Amino acid sequence: VDEQHNQDVNSLGLISSRKTAEAVDILKLMSSTFLVALCQSIDLRHLEENLRNTVKNTVSQVAKRTLTTGVNGELHPSRFCEKDLLKVVDREYVFAYIDDPCSATYPLMQKLREVLIEHALTNGESEKNASTSIFQKIGAFEEELKALLPKEVESARSAIEGGNAAVPNRIAECRSYPLYKFVREELGGEYLTGEKVRSPGEECDKVFQAICQGKIIDPILGCLEGWNGAPLPIC
């Protein structure tokens, strides 16, 4: 009976150790997937911030060029539209329009036009005069924006891909930067865009193998460097 009991205990111990090993592997897989997804979202935010910055600068530039003065160089009522035009850029979700920023069916151009129309409707008697009409300015503003914005957006994309982004990646200022650096630089993990024949599974496997080899320990310790045991900020 005692021998059977010992065998049962040993069997349970073996099963338990196997399940523990499986659980650890699952945890490693979950961690690697989370790290890849986290780096992807960080780079997506970086792309979004740069594209919004480009759109904002371009809209501002075009507004100053086309809305500030009239035909004879006099100040035009439409110059007051710029602030509200930039608010549209700040509020609009970048990826809702950025693949074709000047499309009439996408929200950016629609909402920019709405701003100009609203200002025109409050322009009163001045709208009857061609030299002070805001309605008359809408066409020129839109035409110049259509000519300039797609090129600027493409240039911004190229700059980001070449590592020359106008707006730096904010992750470099965060406590978790060592983990991001580990995935992107040490392991060579790439930002997935769908343009290259590379699956998320390949990226996750790369991180999983590194975790299994214990390579993630130093980056984790780097995140905790200088920690005194007090609660840490989320970032």
Swiss-Prot record:
Pathway: Phenylpropanoid metabolism; trans-cinnamate biosynthesis; trans-cinnamate from L-phenylalanine: step 1/1
Top-rank EC class of the record's enzyme: lyase
Annotated residues for binding of (E)-cinnamate: E3, N6
GO MF term (any one): phenylalanine ammonia-lyase activity
Pfam families xrefs: Lyase_aromatic
InterPro entries: Aromatic_Lyase (IPR001106), L-Aspartase-like (IPR008948), Phe_NH3-lyase_shielding_dom_sf (IPR023144)
GO cellular component, one term: cytoplasm
Post-translational modification: Contains an active site 4-methylidene-imidazol-5-one (MIO), which is formed autocatalytically by cyclization and dehydration of residues Ala-Ser-Gly.
Main location, first listed in the record: cytoplasm
Protein name per the record: Phenylalanine ammonia-lyase
Protein species of origin: Malus domestica
Gene: PAL
